[in-house]
Every structure is written in structure tokens, then in C-alpha cells.
A protein has these predicted regions:
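N-terminal cap/lid segment of alpha/beta-hydrolase-fold proteins
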Residues: 24, 28-87
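Short, surface-exposed "cap/lid" segments of acyl-processing enzymes
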Residues: 83-130
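Glycine-rich "HGGG/HGxG" loop immediately N-terminal to the catalytic nucleophile
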Residues: 128-140, 183-185
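Alpha/beta-hydrolase active-site loop
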Residues: 141-164
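Short beta-strand immediately N-terminal to the catalytic nucleophile in serine-hydrolase-like folds
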Residues: 174-176, 205
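Gly/Ala-rich beta-loop-alpha elbow adjacent to hydrolase catalytic centers
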Residues: 176-180, 184
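Alpha/beta-hydrolase-fold enzymes
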Residues: 190-281
Length: 281
């Protein structure tokens, strides 16, 4: 079980977007593009954030009266996280990347950064997240940017209605990363028409310029697997064996950034294997 968890954690930290590649032009300490994508930001370059901030979970009834299949009995509403300042401050809505929840690691990091900068923050899951599909998607089939934007906008309105009596807001802002970055643009366009928030600033972090091109690029990484994409199972088992053996015989107490950086220094996988791992995620 520990080995399955090990491989899962390693795969989860692999961002499937090679545009995060390191560039020698600005002195990034990890020269390889695939390696930089896998390892992420080195600890020494990470800013310090407060360990705890005033925040609470929101459960939003975005689609009142919606009849959910019995199998989703556990889903009580759309999950959202609300971080708040004591004083009047701008509010920013954060949209998660593809499939991510309202409390994904990246979203929590962004929430703390924005809180530290003086913002109220409300995080929202990706429209492709199961909780969003069940509780907030009008069509229950996500992927159409215009429809997803309308669903997100509706969720934002419900979230704001729930918290507006608790905080003072000086302006509304919007931010999304990855697929959420593209969706932020569509939400901003919708807000120009509806004028509920009149977003002061909209930040798109690493949005795909072309979703089709991004998917094609990711699939191309799979072709670097020995034997091609059809050998994914064999490749996965081989990588799992490598990672688990390294973890077993190494002096590690946790599967964390230090573990990943150690793998990088030991050159545990080839460039082609790194590309295949990114493509698999």
C-alpha cells in the first residue's frame, strides 16, 4: 500500500504542462525543463506564509431543489473556502485548475499568499471537479467554457451572498490558474455584461492559449514511453518499482520535496521517463 501511495504522490506533483520549463535566461536552479516541472519550486525559493489564517469552509446551495442521485448522498453542496481579513479589504475569487478541489495544494498556497497581501479570499473548485459537477453545473457536463463560466459566476454570487454580512469589501477581483485561468477570462467577460462584481483586476496564471494544443502536447509526452502509449501499464509498474525501492532503502521519513529533489540529484529516471511520467498525470 505504501508503494502505491508513493507513486500516487509522485504523480500528483507532476504538473502536466511543459511550459513550466526552466529557462537558463533567468537563473532557475534546476536546468532541465522536465525536472523543473516535476520538482517544482525549490524550498529555498519558496516565500514564507503564515501557518494558519482566519478561514472557514463554505457549503453553497448553488442549485436549490436539485435532485441528486442516491449514490451522491454524501454531497451536501458546493465546497468553498473563505479566508477573511478583520478590516475592509479587496476580495478575490480563486478558480482551481483542471479537476482540482477548493482546497488543492496550489489553491491553498495562493490563498495564503493573497491573504498575506491583504485580500479576503474565496476559493472555488474546478468545474471539472466532481463536487462542482454534482452541485453547481447546470448541464452536469462540463467542458464548454461559456457554460462553465455561467456556473462559476452563479457560485460566486451564492458565496458572496453568504459572507457579505461578515466582511467589508473595497473591490472584487478574480484569479484562476491553468484551466481555471482560461475560465477566469470567460467569467470576467460575463461580469462585463451582468455587472454584479465589476471585477477590478483579473489574473490568469498559466492559462492554456489553446486547450487542443495543450492536450496534443501532453499526449506527445506519452510517445516517449518505451513502446509508446500502449505500454503505459508496463511503464507505470517500472517507475513504481524504481520509486518504491529508492524510498525503501533511502533515509527518508516522508514523501516530500526533499525526497523528490533527492531523486533528481540521483538521476533516478531518464529524460524520456520524466516526460512519460508528466504525460501520465
Amino acid at each position: 500500500m505504501i508503494y502505491q501511495r508513493l507513486m500516487l504522490v509522485v504523480c500528483l506533483v507532476l504538473l502536466p504542462l511543459p511550459i513550466f520549463a526552466a529557462d537558463d535566461g533567468y537563473g532557475y536552479p534546476i536546468p532541465g525543463s522536465y525536472e523543473a516541472t516535476i520538482i517544482g519550486t525549490p524550498a529555498k525559493l519558496m516565500p514564507e506564509f503564515p501557518a494558519n489564517i482566519p478561514s472557514r469552509k463554505l457549503v453553497l446551495d448553488v442549485m436549490p431543489g436539485r435532485q441528486k442521485p442516491a449514490i451522491f448522498f454524501y454531497d451536501e453542496g458546493l465546497h468553498s473556502t473563505f479566508a477573511y481579513q478583520k478590516q475592509k479589504a479587496p476580495l478575490v475569487f480563486l478558480i482551481a485548475g483542471a479537476g482540482a478541489s477548493d482546497r488543492s495544494a496550489k489553491l491553498m498556497t495562493m490563498m495564503k499568499a493573497l491573504y498575506q497581501a491583504g485580500f479576503h479570499v474565496i476559493t472555488l473548485p474546478s468545474p471539472s471537479n466532481a463536487n462542482f459537477i454534482i452541485s453547481a453545473s447546470q448541464s452536469k457536463v462540463t467542458g464548454d467554457m461559456t457554460e462553465d463560466a455561467a456556473d462559476l459566476y452563479r457560485a460566486m454570487e451564492v458565496a458572496w451572498k453568504q459572507v457579505k454580512g461578515e466582511i467589508e469589501v473595497s473591490s472584487f477581483n478574480l484569479c484562476g490558474y491553468s484551466l481555471g485561468g482560461s475560465q477566469a477570462a470567460f467569467v470576467a467577460k460575463l461580469d462585463e455584461e451582468r455587472r454584479v462584481f465589476n471585477f477590478r483586476k483579473v489574473l490568469m496564471i498559466n492559462p492554456p492559449v489553446s486547450l487542443y494544443s495543450s492536450v496534443v502536447s501532453i499526449e506527445a509526452l506519452l510517445e516517449q514511453i518505451p513502446g509508446g502509449a500502449k505500454k503505459q501499464g508496463v511503464f507505470f509498474n517500472k517507475m513504481l518499482s524504481k520509486f518504491s525501492q529508492y524510498y525503501r532503502y533511502g533515509n527518508f521519513v516522508a514523501i516530500n520535496d526533499d525526497f523528490l529533489y533527492s531523486i533528481y540529484k540521483e538521476k533516478l529516471f531518464t529524460r524520456e521517463e520524466a516526460a512519460g511520467l508528466i504525460g501520465l498525470t
